[in-house]
Swiss-Prot record:
Signal peptide from the UniProt entry: none
Keyword hit for Transmembrane helix: no
Protein's name according to its UniProt entry: Putative cysteine ligase BshC
Native source species: Exiguobacterium sibiricum (strain DSM 17290 / CCUG 55495 / CIP 109462 / JCM 13490 / 255-15)
Enzyme class: ligase
Gene name of the record: bshC
Amino acid sequence: MKVQSFDALYDEDSLMQKASRQEFSKYVDHIGTEGMQARSGLLQERQYPHLNALVDELMRQNPRLNDSLKERLELLRTGEAQVVITGQQTGIFGGPMYAVYKLLTCLKVARQTEELLNRPVLPIFWLATEDHDFDEINHLIVPTHDFRTRKLAIQAPDSISRSVSRLAFDQTAVKDIVRQALCTERETPYTKELLALSDRLIESSTTYGEFFASFMGELVDHDIIFFDADTEAVRQLEIPFFERLIQDNAEIRQALSKGIQETTELPDTFLNEEAAHLFVEDIGRDLLYPGQDFVTKQGKTYTELELLALLYASPERFSNSVVTRPLMQDYLFPTLAYIGGPGEIAYWTRLRPLFHHFDWTMPVLIPRMGAVMLQARDEKGLRRHGLSLEQVLHTGVPLTPFDAAAIKRHLHDATLLGTVLVEEVTRIEQQELRTTAVATKLNKQLQLAVETIVDQKRRLHEQANRSDRALQYQLAPDHAPQERIHSILPWLNRYGLNLVQTLRMHYEQTEAEQLKIML
């Protein structure tokens, strides 16, 4: 493996480029090394009375943590340790590759920050199991025979909107998908090992969150702490802050509107200014809307007192929206930094006034690592076309349509020459008083020769185009970023289960955050 900096991965005005620059400080509270130090000092002044119980729950959720990380996690009980957090929906086999890149960034930032602050810094991966959009996590993308994208998806168990954590984990369907996905790949020395690992992890998992954490943990020797907020133990810890979110709901919505107004020049993100930004579980997971009382989309109403009573009786029925989850994260954990992609950074900037409402500052926002992986054959394909990787990512691999008419026009001169030959042969035949239809026979042979040449050229063209479509699929499938479409699964099949650990080693040795990875 060879890793190089690749700044052309994102546009110059992308938040993946801007968010690390000093000019971005007008949208955030802390930035850079000094910002991390300032944030750490402020966290020391805050109280986290629930940390002992939180560590117990983290230990329960992460039985396979390596010994070094377990020892450092114990230091969170007293607040000596602080944390760096990233998060993602729990897609099967890790979802898109950028989830792996988030995880690696979290590990790297935690290590660097630990050295900077001279205190334990823990990497936390927040599992978005509260999310109810099953279609976001239920699939892998694989290539079709002509290198278009195709979804291999698990059917939703029912039509009711439920948190992913509440859905039955379909072991049979997930096993079927991994086999279908690997059928699109060549068998390698790693295939059987990958299948055996997949089957073992699938059979030991009862939820999609568990499977995600088990699979991703295996890739980095269980050197990261996964956190599932949608458990009864965590909901008990969250009661005091849910109470604040209910009681201060009007002020929170006003703060969100202010945050949106202050960041109009940043990329747009849809954050619902009308919602209460809390979900309650009834028949399914339903978003609350404020009014004289709180109302669900299904029309069920709750007074503030009724919601508070329900909260204390059944906290497991409550969950956060995309707006309130970052606030709950800051309530639960002494959070130094959050690692996110461009969309997350865009909406986090809108939340600044909400943090200030609680007399907090925002964590440091750090763009995740971005990357594109190239195989040796991909580099050969680029050289064959005389293309740079940047050109392919921005404009794609040029595919020329097959033009049979043009080829036939090109062969026209040869056909004319053949016609003259036929006429001469015919004249000689007639002089010799032969009566066979030689001219007709020769003309047919000429036409057959033309069609044969056209067919041969068509096959060569299709072969070249197939190779070009394969190159496009590998680097920018359907003209989308590789990291947003590809799963890590086929790459593990090609290069082995140590691939991510090898990438981690190279990534932690470079200062670059946008990478070209040559395999």
